[in-house]
Regions:
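Vicinal oxygen chelate
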Residues: 1-9, 12-21, 47-50, 64-123
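N-terminal beta-strand motif that seeds the catalytic metal site of vicinal oxygen chelate
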Residues: 1-27, 70-72, 120-123
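Short secondary-structure boundary/capping segments
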Residues: 6-8, 39, 47-48, 62-65, ...
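Core segments of cupin and vicinal oxygen chelate
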Residues: 10-11, 17-56
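Short beta->alpha transition motifs characteristic of CBS
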Residues: 19, 40, 59-60, 108, ...
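A short linear hydrophobic-aromatic micro-motif
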Residues: 36-37, 57-59, 93-96
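Short, charged/polar, Gly/Pro-enriched secondary-structure boundary elements
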Residues: 54-57, 66, 114-116
Length: 123
């Protein structure tokens, strides 16, 4: 087992991502609740609403029937170091850390029960 990086620690919950088959309907619903769009919109595949210091994300990239409940996004102090620690524990992420157009660096993995987790940091 590798020695973990001391600077790689969990800092808080960043976002919850939910799936939809109708982005315009979902955006209208959350805007009616007073949620403020910070990325995307009714005609986009991915929309993010600010919720204080966290976010509610909506994705229409379901690739068929919605088979999953969504994703938990957890902020970490250093995405690449945290990724290295995860790999050292024998856990295999879906992909190496990458930069997203919504200004986060992130990677995903699945827990033993099939829940998708994303570890991220704002760029």
């Amino acid at each position: 087992m590798a020695i973990p990086h001391d600077d790689a620690r969990v800092e808080g919950l960043s976002a919850v991502t939910l799936a939809t088959h109708d982005m315009a309907r979902a955006v209208g619903f959350y805007q009616a609740l007073g949620f403020r769009i910070v990325h995307g919109g009714a005609n986009e595949a991915f929309t993010s609403f600010a919720l204080g210091t966290s976010f509610l994300n909506i994705t229409s990239e379901t690739h068929g029937p919605i088979q999953w409940w969504g994703r938990v996004i957890i902020y970490v102090s250093d995405v690449d170091a945290f990724y290295s620690n995860v790999k050292a524990q024998g856990i295999e992420p879906h992909f190496a850390p990458r930069d997203a157009p919504w200004n986060e660096r992130y990677f995903h993995l699945t827990d033993p029960d099939g829940h998708e987790l994303s570890f991220a940091r704002p760029l």
